[in-house]
């Protein structure tokens, strides 16, 4: 459902923020 999609996007965002080193 929609919640699943939002959760997936949120997870992707967290991965990008947590996995991308700030230089």
From Swiss-Prot:
The keyword S-adenosyl-L-methionine does not apply. It comes from Xenopus boumbaensis. Belongs to the gastrin/cholecystokinin family. This is Caerulein precursor fragment BM2. Keywords: Amphibian defense peptide, Antimicrobial, Secreted. Its main location: secreted. GO terms for biological process: defense response. Antimicrobial peptide. Expressed by the skin glands. It is found in: Secreted. One of its GO terms (cellular component) is extracellular region.
